[in-house]
Amino acid sequence: MGSSLRSFIKDVRGAKTLADERAIITKQSAKIRTKLRDDHLPHEKRRVNIQKLLYLYILGEKTHFGQVESINLIASDDFVDKRLGYLAATLLLDESEDLLTLLTNMLNNDLHHPNKYAVSLALTSLGFLSSPELARDLYPDVENIIKNSRDPFLLKKALQCAAKLIFKDVSLLEIFNIEDITKILSSHSICTHGVLLGVTKIIQSILLIGLNRKKDEDEDEDGIDYSNDILSPLSLLLRDFFIRLENMNSKNIEPGYDVQGICDPFLQCEIIYTLKLYFQVGELLNSNNVLDYKDNFCDLLTRIATNTDSTKNSGQAILYETVKTIFSLDLNQPLRVLGINILAKFLAGKDNNTKYVSLNTLLKVVPQEPTAVQRHRKFISHCLQDTDVSIRMRALELSFAILDDSNLVELVNELMKFLAKQDEDSKDLIIYTIDHLIDTFDTRVVKDESWKLDVFFNILKLVGSFINYEKINDILIIINNTSQLSDKSEFLRKMLTISLNGTSAEISEENIGWQLVLIWCIGEYGDLVLNEGNKNGADIINESSITDYLLTLQELYTATNLKIINYILTAALKLSVRFHDAKNIEKLRQLILSYTDSTDLSLQMKSNQYEIFFNQSISVKKIILETMPKFEKITEEQDNGKALSKNLISNEPVDLLSDLLGEDSKAESKASTGDNVKPIDILEEIFGEKNDIAQVPKNANKEESINHSSAVEANSGVTLPLDANKIYDSSSLNVYASLLSANSGLAHLDLYFQAKSLISDLKTFCAVPKAQKLTLGQLYPSSTINASQICKQSLKISGSGKLKLRVKLDFHLNGSSSITNEQFDHKFDETL
């Protein structure tokens, strides 16, 4: 093993096994540790060992034992040692290390070093490693360089270092002098592109500090009046940035900054980003000094977007920054459409990085311009066929984001083509597509139910093995709720034709989704297929073939999947009242009896229960084993601020037999105990996989109150409920809150706004903690409220933590053209 860095790297790369590599690294690490302890080690060998230490750092090994030695190298007068020491310190230390205190004096000395490259090293390291204490101690030295240096190289480094220091310690804004920046910009001899980059960095740090301040706390605890002392002087630089950006975007390219025919794209991107921060802070603080330039900025962005070459990487970088700025500031609609067209050009290109960036950005801007994004559906569909899995995933997410009633059929057909081409390696993409397709049909009303069932038929056939039981449950609900019996019958006929004839090889044993849905449909609608006549496959679909198929599945899955066996038992019981041939009915009875002594307790219990059912008279069985009624899901109505659905479910145990027989349960309603609301699983209810029927809570008094409140609203406008609490009071309006429910992870509440004077164009903006998600309903009955009248808004909050709400209100008072702003916070006693 050689002693040089090169030989060490060669030995590590040449290791044939992981154990050999580990042995080489461990041995070399021990040697380095030993040699660094030697006070008499020559500088040259000490330098080599630090180089090896940095290589160990790159490999992810522990290097803490070399931190002090790195600092010692910085103190050397030899520039080579100093450079290596600063590099090692930058990599091996961070701002939390106590060793940083040892650096203070060394950095201070090097900041006054006669060699500008030594000063540059100190500035770079200080920017990387600065802690708030180090920033306060050494900022005056950095400021001195900014004030007095005429060297563009040092100025560039000093400005970027100052940007890091100011962002690290906000109190430095008190001593920061914006006139220094103005002087630099006005001096053509030192204001090179590198210095301009430094200027943009320091302004970005100052503006980001402003963004982090609350709007109603203009004068912070550090005593700085940000709007007047900082933003107003900074706004004087806006015109200069506009001129420089416009000049760079013109055809007058300086050869020294030409990148693929574009003038310094790095600086252009930084200036655009800086201007974006200007206007974000200006809007936050309502600064006219900044906002007066907004129209000019829109015009400039339009010229940049139009003139920049989108075929080159450098041009794409500028255009991407332009698009981000357009949507971050929510500029006018023509600019937003222009931005989306730029992203569509990126999609049409061949570079995968550009495609990914475009898809990711389009996904974020869909809520702002959904129609404009939908126009480029062709490019999005092409990305679904890309070889890069990350691009396919982003294209999938975007496809579902733009899906609506107008393009439902076209997009779903595209997604079905996508599923047909996937293999098992694309499992994540398949599962994502299936889940979102099922959710789409679950939440949207599709008029063509036959087409909808065809989609599910193809999903089950292509990728049924990837569908989890929860989504199978949703599919069965959708099938069950299909209104036309002929559509259900045709759906089952197609499934049976494939499973019973010679093409059954199309469906593998692993396709559990197909088998579960088919077994359930056989039990529910087997008589429909038989009664309507066998139009297609008349010799295949009959009572005997269906019975034999169930027996085949029983043999196939007895040892591997008890869930399917549960479904088979229920299907056999239901078919006993749908079949007429005694021989087949007896086979079904024997199938059920075969599990009366099963080692699985739940299966044994079910089999014995079903045997008792089986022996009942046909008239009793027909009533009990009727086809499932339409399944109603519990949903919330937030459209136009409507109250929760009146059909609240009782927390009494569900009497399944009484429910099937159509009898009303007369058990007294108990008060809610706050248990989690649990949705009824249609599969478990039918196939009896659990002994206990699901119970869900209900507050009878609250139901009566809600129903009464809804009736009052329908007849005479919104009125305050008795349990509403006042959470805000001002000279313009009162705000009340009524907490409808606050179960584990989910809360529903209504806000009531009572006007004291005429309020028009009321807009509400609500925020919750990061661990929670808020869904906001519309104002009902109107956003205009006369004096003493009330409007209502429904809120749904999900997540975890203490229930807290921040509400901001914008409105016009008494017909005034000016907008009144009010804001308040409220903490509820409940916890999600």
From Swiss-Prot:
The species this protein was found in: Saccharomyces cerevisiae (strain ATCC 204508 / S288c)
Compartments reported by the entry: Cytoplasm; Golgi apparatus membrane; Cytoplasmic vesicle, Clathrin-coated vesicle membrane
Disulphide bonds in the chain: none
A GO MF label: clathrin binding
The protein's name in its UniProt record: AP-1 complex subunit gamma-1
Domain (GAE): residue spans on this chain: 733-832
Miscellaneous remark of the record: Present with 4850 molecules/cell in log phase SD medium.
Tree of life domain: Eukaryota
UniProt keyword terms in alphabetical order: Cytoplasm, Cytoplasmic vesicle, Golgi apparatus, Membrane, Protein transport, Transport
SMART domains from the UniProt entry: Alpha_adaptinC2
Role of this protein: Adaptins are components of the adapter complexes which link clathrin to receptors in coated vesicles. Clathrin-associated protein complexes are believed to interact with the cytoplasmic tails of membrane proteins, leading to their selection and concentration. The AP-1 complex interacts directly with clathrin. Component of the AP-1-related (AP-1R) complex, an adapter protein complex that mediates sorting of cargo SNARE SNC1. In contrast to the APM1-containing AP-1 complex, AP-1R is incapable of sorting CHS3.
